């Protein structure tokens, strides 16, 4: 089988991610014999769920259902007492398995709107880094991949929307790479060691990635036609994944920041972990990762055991024992 041109990474840790919506919406947009694979990275992986995802795909595109790679924050190898948010690790799992030269990440609980795939194809053809637009709505009814009815919600408006242009992608800065779908050449992502798992348990992994890509010389685009609509109800259902954002006294914060080689704080605000994520990447001006105990380009599933043995027992920010989280 020939390698695909685009790998779509769909990561989820939900009992009900709404994959049928995404599968139907994507299939409606694909041309015949589209060179695409969809990789479902599943934090709840089991054989029964594989059958369910395969049934939703219904043979309309190549599908692979894979377990999320081990993480100190989520899954069977976790060091924490409960599952935490670990989107960076899940997306890096997709990069381990992706076979295409271009990778697009799509959030669960969402349906791609009619121009989404065309925007992905355009970005892939030009080798561009692109952020798609999103909206979050309630009371969604999706029929065969088409959003039939929904209710708009002020909390679900993409803050970049007015920056966009319906006719073409526009340039944005690295810190504006976030949201429900974004894409980039796989080799570019591997060259900066993927997403930084320093962000796991906290968040900001997409914004931090955008800043690091910009430091690596990439141009970041925003394509308003690459739109997905996310269900507020599905997104809030089930057991929430823990997110933490601990604070330190100012002096301790600045001492910890200096450990990363940053002596002047670039941001203002609370002295918490989420600010330090940004302070480190902005203060160093580097694309380097600080939370990945491996080099992603060399990582294969057979090497996960060595990675697990290097997992930390404490949180990088404040030294808190992960077992107490």
Please report, for each region that a protein language model flagged, where it lies by residue.
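Short, acidic, metal-binding catalytic loop of nucleotide-sugar glycosyltransferases
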Residues: 24-35
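Short beta-strand/loop segment that forms part of the nucleotide-sugar
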Residues: 34-45, 64-70
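Active-site-proximal specificity loops/subdomain of glycosyltransferases
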Residues: 51-96
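Short aromatic/hydrophobic "clamp" motif used to bind/position activated sugar donors
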Residues: 103
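Acidic donor-binding/catalytic loop of UDP-sugar-dependent glycosyltransferases
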Residues: 108-123
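Short beta-strand-to-loop element that shapes/binds the nucleotide-sugar donor at the catalytic cleft/hinge
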Residues: 130-150
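A recurrent flexible, glycine/aromatic-enriched loop bordering the glycosyltransferase active site
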Residues: 164-184
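C-terminal catalytic/acceptor-binding lobe
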Residues: 200-325
């Amino acid at each position: 089988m020939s390698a695909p041109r685009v790998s779509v990474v769909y990561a989820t840790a939900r009992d009900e991610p709404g994959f049928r919506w995404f599968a139907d919406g994507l299939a409606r947009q694909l041309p015949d014999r589209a060179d695409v694979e969809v990789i479902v990275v599943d934090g709840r992986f089991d054989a029964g769920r594989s059958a369910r995802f395969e049934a939703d795909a219904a043979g309309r595109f190549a599908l692979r259902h894979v377990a999320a790679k081990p993480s100190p924050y989520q899954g069977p190898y976790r060091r924490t007492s409960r599952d935490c948010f670990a989107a960076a690790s899940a997306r890096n799992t997709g990069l381990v398995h992706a076979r295409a030269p271009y990778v697009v990440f799509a959030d669960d609980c969402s349906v791609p709107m009619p121009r989404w795939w065309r925007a992905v194809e355009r970005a892939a053809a030009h080798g561009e880094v692109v952020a798609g637009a999103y909206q979050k709505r309630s009371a969604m009814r999706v029929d065969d991949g088409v959003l039939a009815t929904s209710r708009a919600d002020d909390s679900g408006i993409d803050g970049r929307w007015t920056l966009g242009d319906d006719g073409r992608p526009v340039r944005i800065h690295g810190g504006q790479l976030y949201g429900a779908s974004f894409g980039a050449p796989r080799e570019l992502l591997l060259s900066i060691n993927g997403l930084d798992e320093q962000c796991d348990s906290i968040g900001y992994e997409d914004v931090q990635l955008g800043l690091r890509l910009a430091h690596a010389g990439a141009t970041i685009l925003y394509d308003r036609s690459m739109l997905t609509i996310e269900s507020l109800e599905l997104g809030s259902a089930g057991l929430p994944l823990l997110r933490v954002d601990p604070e330190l006294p100012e002096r301790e914060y600045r001492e910890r920041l200096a450990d990363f080689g940053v002596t002047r704080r670039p941001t203002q605000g609370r002295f918490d972990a989420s600010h330090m994520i940004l302070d480190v990447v902005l203060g160093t001006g580097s694309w380097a990762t600080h939370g990945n105990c491996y080099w992603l380009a060399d990582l294969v599933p057979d090497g996960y055991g060595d990675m697990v043995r290097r997992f930390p027992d404490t949180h990088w920010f404040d030294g808190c024992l992960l077992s107490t989280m």
